[in-house]
């Protein structure tokens, strides 16, 4: 399979979303009991939210960081990491997730479309 892929494909892009990390036990945004339940996204996830609802925003994201500490990468994260490492330089991973489970699984490069819980910047 390696020879076949290397001869035919120069680059592969993988896009992941909430379903990948849900298998590790992370809550998603829209499911029943999801992260938005009880919150208006405009009160939590906008640039102005930090100014107008600082404590609520920090509590929301700190709670998510706390939940993430107890989660481990699952078989999907590991398979993607293995694929990336076997085809080094040919597989580009983009995730809509803000967790670091791809990195913990060993993925060498991950582009986080919506930022990362691992880094926080308040301007």
Each model region followed by its residue ranges:
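Conserved catalytic core of sirtuin-type NAD+-dependent deacylases
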Residues: 1-123
């Amino acid at each position: 399979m390696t020879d076949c892929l290397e001869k035919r494909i120069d680059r592969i892009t993988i896009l992941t979303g909430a379903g990948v990390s849900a298998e590790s036990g992370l809550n998603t945004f829209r499911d029943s009991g999801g992260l938005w339940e009880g919150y208006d996204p405009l009160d939590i996830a906008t640039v102005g939210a930090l100014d107008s609802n600082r404590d609520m925003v920090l509590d929301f994201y700190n709670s998510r960081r706390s939940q993430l500490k107890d989660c481990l990468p699952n078989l999907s994260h590991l398979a993607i990491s293995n694929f990336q490492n076997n085809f080094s330089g040919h597989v580009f991973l983009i995730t809509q997730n803000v967790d670091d489970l791809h990195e913990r699984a060993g993925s060498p490069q991950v582009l986080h479309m919506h930022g990362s819980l691992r880094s926080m910047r308040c301007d």
